[in-house]
A protein has these predicted regions:
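Alpha-helical metal-binding/catalytic segments enriched in His/Glu/Asp
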Residues: 118, 140-189, 232-262, 294-298
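Active-site beta-loop-alpha junctions enriched in small/polar residues
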Residues: 32, 60, 119-121, 185, ...
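Acidic/histidine-rich catalytic neighborhood of metal-dependent amide-processing enzymes
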Residues: 154-226, 273, 278-282
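Residue-level signal for inorganic ion chemistry
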Residues: 27, 195, 296
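Midchain, well-structured core segments that form catalytic/ion-binding scaffolds
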Residues: 202-312
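Acidic/His- and Gly-rich active-site-bordering loop/insert found
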Residues: 4-149, 158, 174
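Short coil/turn connectors at secondary-structure junctions
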Residues: 98, 109-114, 143-145, 173-178, ...
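Generic non-transmembrane alpha-helical segments
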Residues: 22, 26, 43, 47-51, ...
Length: 312
């Protein structure tokens, strides 16, 4: 017996794999970028309510003052698209322009508050429609050019819904409260802050996040106690005199120097300079300012476990 589970003799979650597959393919087919995930939110909320869960959405989920990187025009267009796709107008109105969802399942017994976080947004890339790819052959490839779940958030959201379904069915064997958070706008590190500011993680005894990967074997998981795939975005400005000397040279040197920073020997790290911008007005007048858009990502050391989950 642990502080969250009364018994280890519990049904195999593999029995819910058909539900998982259906959710994942539905989300993969209709990808939406950060802060525009209205169809995805409807899919999540509909599934949770079908389980009998009470769901939190809209301003009860998001702190507007903490929102970053939200394009109002894209949000408005996404709402119109969702309405055309069959999402009820009353539901869209209730969201008040905010995406994402959360639910807390109470077992009715004392125990910890365990929070699971799952992302729902996609990446702005086009999916290959070449025959031979599973999504193409089975008919669930992205229907939206320029948008794709290439980072696996369709599987993350489907995992969250499947786990919520299992917890709901087995709550009599569990203790405490289990909260499921379906986060919008994870790409670009934009959505989490607004949810944390609203209190979604407050009082949590355990906070779990997860990410799929192809670098480990079937039935194997790995875990880290913190910092895994942590990322940071940095904007750097270089200023100089508007003469034949140029800030571009300084920016270029900094770009190369960043790549020479030694990587951590016990983990994985990446540094990417994604944008370089100059404000030159004349060909002869060299840029006086150069702007860097940088991102860093790192993975802390982790442990591996084998699992006994059987295939469907």
């Amino acid at each position: 017996m642990t502080d969250t589970c009364l018994s280890r003799d519990l049904p195999d979650i593999a029995d819910d794999l058909p539900f998982f597959t259906d959710c994942r393919r539905r989300l993969h087919r209709r990808p939406e970028e950060g802060w525009t995930e209205f169809e995805s939110t409807w899919t999540v909320v509909s599934a949770l309510k079908a389980m009998g869960c009470e769901v939190v959405t809209g301003a009860d989920l998001i702190e507007p003052e903490a929102v970053m990187g939200r394009d109002a025009a894209k949000v408005e267009a996404a709402q119109r698209r969702a309405l055309e796709a069959g999402v009820p107008e009353a539901f869209l109105t209730s969201l008040d322009g905010w995406t994402g969802a959360a639910t807390t399942i109470d077992t009715g017994r004392p125990g910890p508050l365990t929070v699971f976080r799952f992302e729902i947004d996609c990446v702005c890339v086009s999916e290959s429609l070449e025959p031979g790819r599973l999504p193409v052959d089975l008919g669930f490839a992205s229907e939206r050019p320029g948008l794709m779940h290439s980072c696996g958030h369709d599987m993350h959201a489907a995992t969250g819904l499947t786990l919520a379904r299992w917890v709901t069915a087995n709550r009599d064997a569990l203790c405490g409260r289990i909260r499921f958070v379906f986060q919008p706008a994870e790409e670009g590190v934009r959505g989490a802050k607004a949810m944390v500011a609203r209190g979604l993680a407050r009082g949590a005894d355990y906070l779990w996040t997860q990410h799929i990967t192809t670098s480990i074997h079937e039935n194997e998981i790995f875990a880290s106690a913190g910092g895994f795939l942590a990322t940071e975005k940095i904007d750097i400005s270089f200023h100089g005199s508007s003469e034949f000397g140029t800030a571009v040279t300084a920016a270029a040197h900094a770009t190369l120097a960043m790549q020479a920073i030694p990587r951590h020997s016990e983990g994985a790290s990446r540094i990417c300079v994604g944008t370089l911008e100059a404000d030159a007005e004349k060909a002869r007048s060299r840029p006086t300012r150069r702007r860097h858009g940088c991102a860093s990502k790192c993975a802390a050391p982790f442990r591996r476990w084998r699992t006994s989950c059987r295939r469907a």
